[in-house]
Amino acid sequence: MMPNRRWLIVPLLIVLGGCEPSGLPATPLFVGVEGHSYAQGSELIQGRLSARFPTGSSVRELKGYLEQQGLQIEPTGRSSTPNSGVAFFKYNGPVCGSQVRVSWEADAAGTVKSIHALYGDTGCP
């Protein structure tokens, strides 16, 4: 009976390890981020976004850029704050992996008030 249980582990490992990309997208926003600490990576991404989208920039352009860089925009209904949004990218497995989250706040006219980038782990159970 024990030898048969080993075969159950193989599909489980494939499912857990094969569902997410293995690294950050090869796009300008993420150049040089991997290999740094999460804090340093967050600073790199934050600096690039702040330089490209200073206060008063178009949220529509920010969203388009984030999608071009490989992030997914969360549906607006999921945000608890009006005129805010979140984009994300997760990789290296659904259980214990890494992620980039970019959140922003906008004014009623649809211009950026603030942007916050976080590069970190997804947390392990």
PLM features per residue range, with description:
Residues 89-123:
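Amphipathic N-proximal alpha-helical interface segments
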Residues 29-61, 69:
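Terminal, regulation- and interaction-focused segments at domain boundaries
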Residues 9-13:
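Hydrophobic helical h-region of N-terminal Sec-dependent signal peptides
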Residues 15-18:
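C-terminal motif of bacterial Sec signal peptides marking the signal peptidase cleavage site
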Residues 1-8:
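Bacterial N-terminal signal peptides that target proteins for export
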Residues 20-23:
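Bacterial signal peptide processing site
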Residues 63-103:
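A cross-family detector of function-defining hotspots
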